[in-house]
Each structure stands twice: as structure tokens, then as C-alpha cells.
């Protein structure tokens, strides 16, 4: 189904307002300035044109996975060239550790995990050869967990998590990973980082790990999560001292750990930002906090997102700002185009504001 012309026209009208930030975005990696970027949005030609209309000039990409060898350099170079034909910089991708390499973290089995880590390291080398200098990944056992969607302004459908709505028998049910204690989880993370980060450092690729989403009580579905509080995040950074070891810093996932995210988010930004360990930012707001929240539009949630972006600027963060999850609505011709356009415009405006251009 094509996007109605009125919708295209509305987006085109906003293009001039985004152009100043867009021009700066294309040079941001050399002028030390934040820029809007997206990782979740699609990559068809039509979708890349939509990003152009929204003032987005940086995008992450996914690549075909080839059994036994991971990524193919030619695939990466072709996609990079295609992005550039739309005025987009392809400067980030995701290592599919959770999706493709179950023995590294999920099962923690040797010698299978050694073979998988070798392939992960080769994928890092391939990314570097293609000129991609940032990769995100995660070391979770449990995937993102949500309860029923909840309605927001104008009929937007937002994801939510309400622990008290999940029956205790569901919370106690083990995955096929079995019981994973905190000690077991840390051992698997340590094992991966010891082998992966030196390769990333050699090939100058920043590796940003994600926090666990959402925070859950110890033993939830048999797993003790270790990256859903401040102490766990600090411990993770200390495992490897390297300028290429850091965070995919998800403001929303961190807020999910907190009782008062409106105030408690700033020590996280100061601590990890001052240590230059924030490599990419997911700019997602929410209403609520630990064990009970609904995701929200950037100016609707509990956190003041101007202050959040200003805090990131003040610690010297200069990479991408990504809207992360966005809500959907029934009358959107593409289900999520309206919310992405809203978030891209908001981020571009906030970037202008924190640099004194508003």
C-alpha cells in the first residue's frame, strides 16, 4: 500500500526545517556533534526516501548472514553504496549474537562457543574493512518481554510491561537455557569480552552492548539478569579497559531499572559518558519505572528529553541519537510512519536546541 500524497506532502513541508540539522549530521563524525540516526526502520528504496524527507542522514543496516562465515564484504559494500546514493551514511550494524550464536551467552557451551566467537570476531573484521566503525550487540539470556499494548495519545499503541499482570507460574517457567545464575551469566560475558574486545580494538570498531530489557526480579524465568542496575553496568565496563568497549546506551531500558527516572537517569549519563563508554543512544521515554511502565513518545514520558540530550552533550557524546521503539496506530498507512516522523523531527529539533540553534 503506498503512502497517501497528503502524508508525503506534509513530510516534504518539514524537510526545510530539518535541513540545517541534516547538513550538520553528515559531518557530525568529524565535528563532534550528535546526529539523528535510526536502526529499526526499514531499508527499502522507498523507506530510504522517507528518511531523506525526515532529515535523517545516518542509518544502521542488517546484512545477509552466511552460515559458517557470517557477513560477506561485498554485501556490506553494496549496501553501503546504495545508502550513499540516498544521502545516507551506513556507519553502524548489529552483531546477531542472541539470534545466531546461542552457545556464547544463552547456553554458554564449550567448545561450541569458541567456534561462534571466532565467527563473531571475523564479522567485526569484515565490518571494519567495509568502513563500519560501530557495532551493537547484546548479552541477554531473555529477549525483550512485554505484556499487552496500551493506548496513548491519538490512539497510538505503545508497548508496556506490568509484572503484576504476569501469573507467578509464568514467571517461574524456565526457558531451555535452564537456570542461569548471576555467576553463570557473568562468566559467559567475561569469556566473550576477553576474546572479542581485543579484535575490536585492533580493527577500531566500537562495540556497544545493550542493557537488559526490561528489568526483572532475580530468578525470573530462571535467569538472574546482571545488566539491569547501576552496579552491573559499572562492572561490565571494568571487564575490559578499551576505548572500543562500551554501551548501546538505551535511555528507555535504563529508565526501566529505576523508581524515579526523571531524576535518576543523570548519574548514569555522567558516569558512563565521562568515561567515554557511550557509543550509541536509544532515545526512548516511558511512563512508570521498575517492573511497571508504558513506553511513550519522547515529550510525553517521565523524563525531560531536552535535559537528557543536554546532559549527553555536556559529557561529550557525539554519535547517533536513535528513536528506538516507536508506537503504531491503525490509521497510519505504514503502521509506524507517523510515529517515526514525529520522533525524527523531535530529535532534530532537540539537537538544534542543545547546540543553541533553536
What are these regions (language model features)?
Residues 56, 96-98, 212-214, 284-288:
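Short connector loops/turns at beta-strand edges and beta->alpha or beta->beta junctions
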Residues 137-142, 211-213, 325-326:
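Short, well-ordered beta-to-alpha junction loops that form the rim of enzyme active sites
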Residues 169-185, 211-222, 256, 329-331:
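Active-site-proximal beta-alpha loop/turn segments in soluble metabolic enzymes
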Residues 7-9, 41, 45, 110, ...:
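An N-terminal assembly and electron-transfer interface module characteristic of large anaerobic redox
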Residues 29-69, 74-76, 82-86, 90-95, ...:
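Ligand-binding pocket scaffold of soluble enzyme catalytic domains
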Residues 63-190, 194, 201-202, 253, ...:
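Structural motif corresponding to the early beta-alpha repeats
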Residues 44, 72, 181, 302-304:
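A diffuse structural propensity rather than consistent per-protein peaks
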Amino acid at each position: 500500500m503506498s503512502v497517501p500524497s497528503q502524508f508525503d506532502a506534509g513530510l516534504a513541508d518539514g524537510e526545510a526545517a530539518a535541513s540545517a540539522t541534516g547538513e550538520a549530521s553528515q559531518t557530525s563524525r568529524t565535528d563532534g556533534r550528535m546526529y539523528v540516526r535510526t536502526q529499526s526502520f526499514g531499508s527499502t528504496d522507498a523507506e530510504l526516501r522517507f528518511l531523506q524527507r525526515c532529515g535523517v542522514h545516518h542509518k544502521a543496516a542488517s546484512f545477509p548472514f552466511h552460515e559458517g562465515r557470517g557477513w560477506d564484504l561485498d554485501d556490506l559494500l553494496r549496501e553501503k553504496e546504495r545508502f550513499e546514493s540516498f544521502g545516507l551514511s551506513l556507519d553502524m550494524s548489529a552483531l546477531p549474537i542472541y539470534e545466531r550464536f546461542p552457545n556464547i551467552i544463552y547456553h554458554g557451551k564449550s567448545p561450541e562457543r569458541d567456534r561462534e566467537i571466532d565467527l563473531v570476531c571475523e564479522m567485526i573484521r569484515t565490518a571494519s574493512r567495509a568502513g563500519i566503525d560501530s557495532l551493537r550487540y547484546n548479552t541477554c539470556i531473555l529477549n525483550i518481554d512485554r505484556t499487552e499494548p496500551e493506548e496513548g495519545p491519538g490512539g497510538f499503541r505503545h508497548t508496556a510491561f506490568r509484572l503484576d499482570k504476569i501469573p507467578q507460574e509464568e514467571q517461574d517457567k524456565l526457558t531451555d537455557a535452564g537456570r542461569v545464575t548471576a555467576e553463570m551469566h557473568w562468566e559467559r560475558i567475561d569469556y566473550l569480552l576477553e576474546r572479542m574486545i581485543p579484535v575490536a580494538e585492533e580493527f577500531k570498531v566500537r562495540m556497544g552492548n545493550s542493557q537488559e530489557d526490561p528489568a526483572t526480579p532475580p530468578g525470573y524465568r530462571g535467569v538472574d539478569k546482571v545488566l539491569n542496575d547501576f552496579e552491573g553496568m559499572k562492572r561490565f565496563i571494568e571487564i575490559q579497559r578499551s576505548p572500543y568497549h562500551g554501551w548501546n546506551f538505551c535511555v528507555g531500558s535504563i529508565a526501566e531499572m529505576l523508581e524515579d527516572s526523571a531524576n535518576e537517569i543523570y548519574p548514569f549519563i555522567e558516569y558512563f559518558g565521562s568515561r567515554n563508554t557511550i557509543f550509541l543512544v536509544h532515545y526512548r521515554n516511558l511512563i512508570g519505572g521498575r517492573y511497571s511502565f508504558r513506553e511513550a513518545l519522547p515529550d510525553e514520558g517521565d523524563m525531560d528529553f531536552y535535559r537528557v540530550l543536554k546532559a549527553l552533550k555536556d559529557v561529550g557524546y557525539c554519535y547517533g541519537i536513535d528513536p528506538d521503539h516507536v508506537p503504531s496506530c491503525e490509521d497510519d498507512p505504514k503502521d509506524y510512519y507517523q510515529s517515526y516522523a514525529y520522533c525524527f523531527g523531535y530529535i532534530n529539533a532537540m539537537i538544534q536546541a542543545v547546540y543553541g540553534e533553536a
